[in-house]
Amino acid sequence: TAVEAPITAKNHGVRPDIEANYIAEMVRLELYDTFGDDLYNNGMTVYTTILSERQKAANDAIYQGVLDYDMRHGYRGSIETRIDLIDAPLDEQTQALQDIPRFRDWQTALILSVEETTADARLANGERTTLPWDSIKWAKAYINEDTWGPAPSKVADVLVPGDIVRVRPDIDVEWLLAQKPTVQ
């Protein structure tokens, strides 16, 4: 019967080549001004073109601007601290890290140990890495949106063993301590 049959339906709609939500909204508003509510009721199909290189550049600039702004306003701390994971087997460490939702091409990392100018970490993909001071020194403590603490002078001012943090790929250092931006 139809009730027992597996659901095999899937969306066959057009998939955009690039994220362009603002352009799509601008087009929708223009069409609404022209067609009113008929826009939604008459089965219209609308295609528009943009220069994808410019849109990608705009998206990248906004993304980088948001990250820079968020970093300037301080580090809000680790996702959580799990001291029990430091000596746990590799598969348990990686599973705990993989259970945390991903953000873009970032990784979650478990801080295994902290030295004066470095932190040893396990990434969600199982690799071990060292976070150098240059990847951490930006992380002055966030107090509120208008106030943050002094710049840290050593890694222990920012991280402790057992911290679970996010790191993102960086040109200057392999991995940069990161946090998911909280902008409105």
What are these regions (language model features)?
Residues T1-T108, L112-A124:
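Non-catalytic, structured segments within soluble enzyme domains
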Residues N42-I50, A151-V160, Q184:
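Active-site loop and adjoining helix of the penicillin-binding protein/serine DD-peptidase-beta-lactamase fold
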Residues R54, A109-V114, P150-W175:
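Flexible glycine-rich surface loops and low-complexity tracts that mediate binding to linear polymers
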Residues Q93-I100, I143-V155:
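N-terminal post-signal-peptidase region of extra-cytosolic proteins
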Residues G126-E145:
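A short macromolecule-binding patch
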Residues W175-Q184:
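Short, compositionally biased
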